[in-house]
Amino acid sequence: MSDGRDFVERDVHDFATAAETAIAGRLEAEGHEVIRGDGPLWTSEVATTEGRRLADARPDLTIFHYPVWAFPHFSMLAAEASRGPLLLLANVDPQFPGMVGMLAAGGALDQIGRAHARAWGDIRESAVL
């Protein structure tokens, strides 16, 4: 997930992509098959399209990663397309407020009754991933 404003997305895109790559790498190193999105969800259209595309792959678990602030409705749109278990994962970084975005998304998903779990911390720590 990423910020929906184009001028902010440009500034955080590389950070968000690097964080996603690190998470995917850690999961793959542990033997998990990772089905990645085509990029950060930063518009309503992308959230809906990617949510449907990933749901069609029928993953055992869908992880919404929040490396930076993200508008909660992106999570609601993507979650609407997914049917399996959902994990909201946020980094804790003073420069990039990913946890704030994850908490906002979690509240939005609670409001629509979409079950999910939440995890947060330094993604480089084994206790987090």
Predicted regions and their residues:
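An N-terminal assembly and electron-transfer interface module characteristic of large anaerobic redox
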Residues: 1-129
